[in-house]
Amino acid sequence: MRVGIFGGTFDPIHVGHMIVAEQVMDELGMERVVFVPSGIPPHKEASSVRAPAEDRYEMVLAAIAGNERFSADRIEIDAGRPMHTVETVPLLKERLPGEEWFFITGADEVSNLLSWKDPDRLLEEVVMVAATRPGYDLSRLGHLEARLKNFDRIFPVECTRVDVSATGIRRRILQGKSIRYLVPEGVREIILSRGLYRADARRTRGELLKEERS
């Protein structure tokens, strides 16, 4: 069985994430994709994560509802500390069924793979799927070939381009603009009902790292 792991902050999860997951799953014949929201991301400043981990996890659950081939795992949230992907993957492989494992992320993130912890060891555990937009210049990944012995475990998959980003969604919320159709409807309802990403919510929901570390 082929299983994809889709990690990220999902702050918030949006239609771009859903399209990538569906198209990669279809292209590579995966049985399922497991979404793994980060708890305390090791590569981001604490202040850059806007919504608490529990809210982000519940938004992921809302986004994947109705797709039986999508699931979510809170392994990184429950860890209560920053977890690197190379730590997360072996633990997931122990607790979930699967024979072939893939890690799904954007090509721009893959181009920075040398900054990840133990990238070659990670590539021994999974095939790294670099989701690209149409027309993406694959030579932007070429610098990795001489530095990674497992470079051949990086596999680009072209996905439909949707000009949606979590940053742009948060900006629209701050500006009082609609985010309908940019995120799944269940995600939009959580954001609105909890007042996430509004200017007055930044600190009220958000001594988040202090809360999540305690």
Curated annotation (Swiss-Prot):
Q: State the EC number(s).
A: 2.7.7.18
One GO molecular function term?
ATP binding
Does the record bear Transmembrane in its keywords?
no
Reaction(s) the record says it catalyses = nicotinate beta-D-ribonucleotide + ATP + H(+) = deamido-NAD(+) + diphosphate
Q: What keywords were assigned to this record?
A: ATP-binding, NAD, Nucleotide-binding, Nucleotidyltransferase, Pyridine nucleotide biosynthesis, Transferase
Name a Pfam family for this protein. Answer: CTP_transf_like
Q: What class of enzyme is it?
A: transferase
What family does the Swiss-Prot or TrEMBL record give for this protein? Belongs to the NadD family.
NCBIfam families the record matches: cyt_tran_rel, nicotinate (nicotinamide) nucleotide adenylyltransferase, PRK00071.1-3
Q: What does this protein do?
A: Catalyzes the reversible adenylation of nicotinate mononucleotide (NaMN) to nicotinic acid adenine dinucleotide (NaAD).
* Identification of the protein by name: Probable nicotinate-nucleotide adenylyltransferase
What's the source species for this entry?
Answer: Rubrobacter xylanophilus (strain DSM 9941 / JCM 11954 / NBRC 16129 / PRD-1)
